[in-house]
Amino acid sequence: MDFGALPPEINSGRMYCGPGSGPMLAAAAAWDGVAVELGLAATGYASVIAELTGAPWVGAASLSMVAAATPYVAWLSQAAARAEQAGMQAAAAAAAYEAAFVMTVPPPVITANRVLVMTLIATNFFGQNSAAIAVAEAQYAEMWAQDAVAMYGYAAASASASRLIPFAAPPKTTNSAGVVAQVAAVAAMPGLLQRLSSAASVSWSNPNDWWLVRLLGSITPTERTTIVRLLGQSYFATGMAQFFASIAQQLTFGPGGTTAGSGGAWYPTPQFAGLGASRAVSASLARANKIGALSVPPSWVKTTALTESPVAHAVSANPTVGSSHGPHGLLRGLPLGSRITRRSGAFAHRYGFRHSVVARPPSAG
């Protein structure tokens, strides 16, 4: 634009009627804030990547992450530099406006000059105001030139401040093929839902035939893991219980596996029912009985009558069997012959007697 062709009223009016340098200063502050944020983000990304790839995370996944994140970190750093430059340019534009504003003639001064010239011309009846009119016109020409110079300088400075390096687009850190795969998956959903609904509508002959299908379908993966863990714990607990029970049996019952206590058998079975039913064991000193020259326990002859005749103490030819219902001695007493002797009168076994043998007659063949 040719600012020299415009009168000072227009140039000065444009400079004074606008909002001033306030918006440009606000823009400069905003760009500075953006630059700081981008710089912090780039520094944070670089620090985290260096910390992860330093020791804890290595391998193909780490290399893939670094390859995808490094260009983005570089873009953040570049964007921070561009934002800082934009802030500086906005501040430069505000400074150029301030300089042009100072150089521009205020509109009231121009208006006063124009009023003075018109007044001098109106009252110049005899030419007495010609010199004053020339001076006022010269001042107006200076205002014109001053505004033109200010506007030309402001246009050049603002044009230089408005030259910004465009921001580059951020690099792609994702796979564009994923969008195609997602579209294909979404397109396949109606058919999948239709197949699921048709499978759910299948009629079963017996409702109890598909209880397992409903049960498994209602169990979530987390619940399945919990069920498997509980089953494992129950089997483990059962094995441990059997192990400790076998140890307790060996310690309590002995190698045979069964031992009767004071109250009877540990297991209520017929073969152990009589265990522990005898009287408590007792012992005495110098109280043994005599059978001939043999010392025997008192229980051996406890049931033998002491008033029997000497013949009754002989060993009977038909020994009696001790009753199992009698007192529980060690050998259940000795067989007695006195009772048999009483039934047979004075008969008794005689030892050392020589029997007479009758020979077989020849007539017997």
Curated annotation (Swiss-Prot):
Annotated Pfam families: PPE (PF00823), PPE-SVP (PF12484)
Membrane-crossing segments per the record: none
InterPro entries on file: PPE_C, PPE_dom, PPE_sf
Traits of the deletion mutant: Mutants with simultaneous deletion of PPE25/PE18/PPE26/PPE27/PE19 genes have a slight growth defect at 100 mM phosphate in defined media, and at 30 mM phosphate, growth is severely impaired. Knockdown of PE32 or PPE65 in PPE25/PE18/PPE26/PPE27/PE19 deletion mutants result in a severely impaired growth in phosphate-limiting media.
GO biological process, one term: response to host immune response
Family in the record: Belongs to the mycobacterial PPE family.
Protein name in UniProt: Uncharacterized PPE family protein PPE25
